[in-house]
UniProtKB/Swiss-Prot annotation:
Residues 362-391 have a biased composition (Basic and acidic residues). It is found in: Plastid, Chloroplast. It comes from Arabidopsis thaliana (Mouse-ear cress). Residues 646-668 have a biased composition (Polar residues). Coiled coil: none annotated. Component of the transcriptionally active chromosome (TAC) complexes. Interacts with PTAC7. This is Protein PLASTID TRANSCRIPTIONALLY ACTIVE 10.
Length: 668
């Protein structure tokens, strides 16, 4: 499409110039006066930035970019200690404080802009006298302050004894009682200190007093029982590992090619045991993993900024001495063995502690409180409901009563059909009836719709298998009642069935449930009185908190404010709909509901008819006046519909009411 007929000569930058991306000062050529035909277009919003604009709208923070970044890193709890940036990211960092559409000011930003060109980077690498690979390797060097070497000081020589674990044997494993008693005597000898000088002296002389305190014989008996347990459970543990852990990662059980004979299982270790190991993995957010000769690697919790100094002392492949601080369930916790470094000792460098050891969430975990108690974690605070269970009413509705009622109705329906159509059941026994279709318990409820007195209502179909019914007993019961009814009719008396067999069974279930609820109430009252007498808390500490603990405007699923929108719960029930229609009808007749007592119903009808006639004549007169005004003066305000400002009696039925949130709102 040709917009301008006048030919114009525009000059464009030369694309063959390789330095066209280099920022230069803006050069303005003298304006040329060109006569143009009037054309409709859009002017550019980009104007050169002057100094006053930068003073008004420029960044007013006194902190430099590096200081602001450092403060942000400290507040977040983690910082990139040595940033490894690409040339593009480095230029973006150093040009943040530069203005837009203006030449670069700082020499760092100008140098970073030059480094965007590969030719300039190669030139700088050549000037430094290194290869390109060496230059890239230099970007990954640690450029921060390096601390002095860490020296672990000892109070004296340390003697380690081989002590059997206190939790031996594992659950479900039976051992010889006398051997177990002999093994557990080692725990009594732990209170006696073994000095290195006494041990050397006894070994030279040939005495066994100090050597017996080392519990070597008891530990050998434990090793014998431990090896028997490994032989019987090794294959089972490996199968469970493949079933629960699809992929291997540090801290989990080694299996397949990684497993070697002689690796120690978890029952071999106990908290407080000191081991030698090798660092295998370092993880920024989890910590260090140490191989101590077992099927599980030990986990040293380290995270975040603590690695800034620790990384200089703990490296992959170094030999360390560690102490086991905790042994946990491998099926619930991710890392069963928790360690601490003894040599080199870095306890004084760890500040960011894990709140809780990481755990697994399995498919069968449905109760979060049970998981929390399993892991030894405190309860999650929740709002105090304010209800007292000891003051609530007793329960008397057994949950199985609904199923019994469903079975009872199905039995009576089949018996009714049996009496109405005896030919259909001729030659058949009720106990031998079978389902017409394959019964599926997952699909025993069907939802649909049905009409009742010209009203469409939701319908629920409950399917029951014939195998669950006791039709023979129900038929015998009905025949007995029919016999009694015939006898009473012959005597000229009436007969009324009090309760059927299934009704009596339902009452028994309800009474059983009520009795159980009563016993639970009595047990709860005894527990409350005992806790109050001993000064113990009535609830789990930290489980419930007052409403002020959570602040204001917290989500409450029980409040209608969070179930619907801001307008509240819409009233779409049948009763409220009839009330709205009645109010709208009254308004259409009288106009206001408070004038019913001023006149009779007939007078009100006549008055509304007259008002409607007057309204129609006024409307025709207004149309004539509007047409005349439009001819005289074309004004936008003439299109306004003044009929909406008429009397309230013009408001008709519920169809004319305004809709708010899907609900018809009545206006007074």
């Amino acid at each position: 499409m040709q917009i301008c007929q006048t030919k114009l000569n525009f000059t464009f930058p030369n694309p063959t110039n390789p330095n066209f991306c280099k920022p230069k000062a803006l050069q303005w050529s003298p304006p040329r006066r060109i006569s143009l035909l009037p054309c409709r277009g859009f002017s550019s919003d980009e104007f050169p930035v002057d100094e006053t604009f930068l003073e008004k709208f420029g960044p007013k923070d006194k902190d430099t970019e590096d200081e602001a970044r450092r403060r942000n890193w400290i507040e977040r709890g983690w910082a990139p200690w040595e940033e490894i940036l690409t040339p593009e990211a480095d230029f973006a960092r150093k040009s943040l404080n530069e203005g837009e559409e203006v030449p670069l000011q700082s020499p760092e930003a100008i140098e970073a802009f030059k480094m965007l060109r590969p030719s300039y980077r190669k030139k700088k690498i050549k000037e430094m006298g290194i290869t390109e690979d060496e230059w890239y390797a230099k970007q990954f060097e640690i450029r921060g302050d390096k601390p002095p070497p860490l020296e672990t000081s000892w109070a004296g020589p340390m003697v380690l004894r081989q002590i059997p674990p206190r939790d031996w044997p594992p659950r479900g494993w039976e051992v010889d009682r006398k051997e177990l008693e002999f093994i557990r005597e080692a725990h009594k000898l732990m209170a006696e200190r073994v000095w290195l000088e006494d041990l050397d002296k006894d070994l030279r002389v040939g005495e066994d007093a100090t050597v017996d305190k080392m519990c070597l014989e008891r530990f050998k008996v434990f090793l014998k029982q431990y090896k028997e347990w490994v032989e019987d459970n090794k294959d089972r543990l490996e199968e469970e590992s493949y079933k629960l852990d699809q992929d291997f990662y540090p801290g989990r059980r080694k299996r397949g090619k990684d497993y070697e004979d002689g690796m120690y299982e978890l029952p071999f270790y106990y908290p407080g045991m000191v081991c030698e190991g090798t660092v295998t993995t370092l993880h920024l957010y989890q910590g260090a993993f140490v191989d101590i000769g077992g099927v599980h690697e030990g986990w040293v919790p380290i995270k975040g900024n603590d690695w800034f100094w620790i990384r200089h002392f703990i490296k992959v492949g170094m030999h360390v001495i560690v102490e086991i601080t905790a042994k946990r369930d491998p099926y619930r916790f991710r890392f069963p063995l928790e360690l601490r470094f003894v040599h080199p000792n870095i306890d004084h460098m760890i500040f960011n502690k894990f709140d809780f050891p990481p755990i697994f969430h399995r498919d069968g975990d449905t109760n979060p409180d049970e998981i929390r108690r399993d892991c030894g974690r405190p309860p999650e605070p929740r709002k105090d409901p304010g209800s007292k269970p000891e003051e609530e009413g007793l329960l008397s509705d057994h949950p199985y009563v609904d199923k019994l009622w469903q079975i009872h109705v199905a039995e009576q329906m089949i018996l009714g059909d049996y009496e109405a159509n005896p030919a259909k059941y001729e030659g058949k026994k009720l106990s031998e009836l079978s389902d017409d279709e394959d019964f599926d318990e997952q699909k025993d409820i069907e939802y649909g719709e049905a009409y009742y007195k010209k009203t469409k209502l939701p319908k629920v179909i409950l399917k029951t298998s014939v195998k669950e019914l006791d039709l023979e007993a129900a038929l015998t019961e009905r025949q007995h009642h029919n016999k009694l009814m015939m006898e009473a009719k012959a005597r000229g008396e009436g007969y009324k069935i009090d309760k059927l067999r299934r009704n009596i069974e339902m009452d028994e279930y309800d009474f059983l449930h009520w009795r159980r609820s009563l016993e639970e109430r009595e047990a709860l009252l005894r527990d409350i009185s005992s806790r109050q007498a001993l000064g113990l808390p009535l609830e789990e500490p930290g489980r419930y908190k007052p409403g002020s603990f959570f602040g204001k405007d917290q989500y409450d699923p029980t409040s209608a404010l969070y179930q619907y929108d801001y307008w509240g719960e819409p009233k779409n029930s049948e009763i409220s709909k009839q009330e709205r229609m009645k109010d709208a009808h009254n308004k259409s007749i009288v106009g206001k509901g408070n004038v019913w007592y001023d006149m009779s119903y007939d007078d009100a009808i006549k008055q509304t008819i007259e008002k409607r006639k007057e309204g129609s004549t006024l409307a025709s007169q207004e149309e004539e006046t509007e047409s005349e005004e439009e001819e005289e003066d074309d004004d936008d305000f003439d299109d306004f519909d003044y009929s909406i400002l008429s009397d309230e009696s013009s408001i008709g039925y519920s169809e004319q009411q305004p809709l708010v949130n899907g609900t018809q709102v009545l206006t007074d």
